Regions:
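Catalytic core of DAGKc-family lipid kinases
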Residues: 1-112, 118
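Short secondary-structure boundary/capping segments within folded domains
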Residues: 12-13, 120-122, 158-159
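A short, compositionally biased
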Residues: 69-77, 126, 163-164, 169-174
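Generic structural hydrophobic/aromatic packing signal, biased to beta-strands
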Residues: 78-80, 105-107, 131, 167-169, ...
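Short low-complexity stretches enriched in small and charged residues
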Residues: 84-94, 121-126, 150-155
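Internal helical hairpin/lid segments
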Residues: 100-144, 149
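ATP/nucleoside-binding phosphotransfer catalytic cores, i.e., glycine-rich phosphate-binding loops
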Residues: 133-181
Length: 181
């Protein structure tokens, strides 16, 4: 279910008895991947940590998840194929060699990556990924990095930003890949 302008998104309800409490984006993606691999429905997840939790305004209070104040929201589930290995992700995929040189590519479903507001317009229920492709010089990279905490690194002429339902990218050189971690 994709978010639509002017329509309610989510509802208040306690985490179901079979819901799974997860403390990180890695745990959340693993729970989804495990259910899919077993042919089961994706479980309702109670987020108490991670970038997706922060994006959704989560407080990290596990006890609150079992109360009627808990909010249940549908979020997009994405996949990335890395050299033939398919991985589920809920928050982000980052491809880079170094933060200080070379290409950096990101697909963001969550707004945050740690303390950085990388994708200020990202919404985990809109059916879109916010992708970023950057190869900045050292001076511009340092300036952009200082502005990441507030999300004011954008717009930037050397950072290509797109909002897309799917992305296919061929990287310029071999890069390390981080999936929800």
């Amino acid at each position: 279910m994709t978010l639509e302008r002017g329509q309610p998104w989510g509802s208040t309800a306690p985490l179901p008895d079979d819901g799974i409490i997860v403390a990180s984006d890695t745990e959340a993606a693993s729970a989804v991947a495990t259910a899919r691999a077993a042919g089961r429905a994706v479980p309702v997840l109670g987020l108490v940590g991670g970038d997706l939790c922060r994006t959704l305004g989560g407080t990290g209070d596990a006890a609150r998840l079992r109360t009627s104040d808990a909010v249940t929201l549908p979020v997009d589930i994405a996949e990335v194929d890395v050299d033939g290995d398919v991985h589920v992700f809920l928050a982000h995929v980052i491809a880079r060699r170094s933060w200080w040189r070379g290409q950096v590519w990101a697909a963001m479903n969550a707004e945050w990556l740690g303390r950085w507001d990388i994708a200020p317009r990202a919404h985990p229920g809109d059916g879109l990924l916010d992708t970023f492709d950057a190869s900045l010089g050292l001076r511009d990279r340092a300036r952009a990095r200082r502005r990441l905490e507030t999300g004011t690194h954008l717009p930037h002429p050397a950072i290509e930003q797109r909002r897309v339902p799917a992305a296919r990218v061929a990287l310029d050189e071999p890069l390390d890949i981080w999936v929800d971690g």
